[in-house]
Amino acid sequence: LDISPINPGHTLVIPKEHHAGSSSIPEDVAGRMFRVGSRIGVALKRALDYDGFNLHLADGGCAGQVVMHAHLHVVPRGVEDGFRWNWRQEPYETDELRNETAARIAEKIKLD
């Protein structure tokens, strides 16, 4: 369990091998982390009567990563828990800019 939980039951899924961030985690390990996280989330809903859960992984200090060992947060959520992610969402100025951004990302995706 997280020592400073957002809500009671907030759990961490931590790989045994050291990986500073998500980019160095092998795909099979990352997949297992999310499968385990989802199973824990379902258990939290059943055991502690939550309405939902978030799976959260921060990669890098600017993304909120404090402990430099990759880990996945399983945050149980209630309709009225008062917690809000601090999202700042703004649409792309144009469809062309959105498409250019998507193309640049697609060029760098490595799939084996």
What are these regions (language model features)?
Residues L1-D112:
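HIT superfamily nucleotide-processing domains
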